[in-house]
A protein has these predicted regions:
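Extracytoplasmic catalytic/substrate-binding loops of multi-pass membrane glycan-assembly enzymes
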Residues: 56-70, 77-94, 102-106
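Alpha-helical membrane-inserting segments
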Residues: 13-17, 21, 90, 94, ...
Length: 168
């Protein structure tokens, strides 16, 4: 019974996305052909991933991330490239934001939101690629639903870890 309910729900989501994609389409010669669709996908992904961020506030801090955090907040902690320097410095920007509020959790949450936005932009580009190459709207809707509803992407989007940004 639950499998039937899941099937009906997935069908309804894909049908709804297909209708929305039809309404967002613009004339063939328009420069903004994909713009509204991509904005919709971006907002949809962030909304779909928000419950994960709220559940794991300030984000899902992985064990490896503590080394990068220590490199940024401890004076005299030796820097090394076991965790990429670019990632550590990027994370450091958000830790400094947290310092402004005297709460590193705020900085980590800002990092999680920024990483989620970057990953959503990458996925938007993938959806745009499908659209530009003439993929049928059902495939586009299935792709959007997959990225929005598959928990792995939401979990990865809020993970304070070096891998999500490099794999995006």
């Amino acid at each position: 019974l639950w499998l039937l309910a899941a099937f009906v729900l997935c069908y309804a989501v894909m049908a709804l996305l297909s209708i929305i994609i039809d309404r967002l389409e613009t004339p063939e010669g328009s420069d903004s052909r994909n713009k509204r669709l991509l904005i919709f996908v971006f907002v949809l992904l962030l909304l779909a991933w928000t419950p994960y961020l709220l559940s794991f506030y300030p984000g899902s801090v992985q064990g490896d991330s503590f080394w990068s955090i220590e490199q940024m907040i401890e004076v005299g902690h030796p820097n090394n490239n076991h965790h990429p320097v670019a990632y550590t410095l990027f994370l450091g920007i958000f830790l400094k934001i947290g310092e402004l509020f005297s709460d590193y959790n705020i900085g980590i949450c800002c990092y999680s939101v920024a990483q989620s936005a970057l990953m959503a932009l990458v996925i938007c580009r993938a959806v745009g690629f499908l659209r530009e190459n003439g993929a049928h709207r059902v495939y586009i809707a299935a792709t959007i639903a997959f990225y929005a509803l598959e928990p792995l992407f939401a979990s990865y989007a809020i993970a304070l870890w070096k891998d999500p940004l490099y794999s995006a």
